[in-house]
Design a protein with these regions (language model features):
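Electrostatic, structured charged patches in enzyme active sites and in nucleic-acid/phosphate-binding
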Residues: 1-138
Length: 138
């Protein structure tokens, strides 16, 4: 199966290059240089949703009940890296993205990447677990 960027899906991976990178990371995990390697199956919130609240009147049998209803104005923006793992040498979690030169420049990826890096910097400044964003360009 080919997607719009002509990347051929290889089983669970979105491209041959992702599969290749995963194959290179597995020996590092076996050597103990990294741990907890996994394909990222969750997304990070980079911009929360924007919602308004309106009062809705609901007719009951004997009275009118007012209910506050949440209306989503803008959906949340999320970022899903290709892989995440823990780097034992630097004691950092790593979010790894595999992108071609062309897809790196297209659509909303540059903005999402900047927002994700900004979120990680903010997270790291709060003294929590340290995260790093790495990108492999092919």
């Amino acid at each position: 199966m080919t997607n719009k960027f002509n990347a051929k899906k290889t089983g669970v991976f979105d491209s041959k290059v992702e599969k290749f990178v995963y194959g290179k990371l597995l020996p590092l995990q076996e050597q103990g240089l990294i741990r907890s390697l996994r394909r990222c199956n969750f997304s990070f919130l980079i911009i929360p949703e924007i919602a308004d609240y309106t009062i809705v009147e609901k007719q009951l049998k004997t009275k009118i009940k007012r209910i506050e209803k949440k209306v989503i104005v803008e959906r949340a923006a999320r970022y899903t890296p290709d892989f995440i793992y823990f780097d034992c040498e630097t004691n950092e979690y790593v979010a790894l993205e595999v992108k071609s030169f062309i897809t790196r420049k297209q659509h909303d990826y540059p903005l999402r990447r900047k927002l994700f890096r900004w979120r990680l910097r903010d997270h790291n400044a709060r003294g929590r677990s340290q995260w790093r964003f790495d990108e492999i360009e092919f």
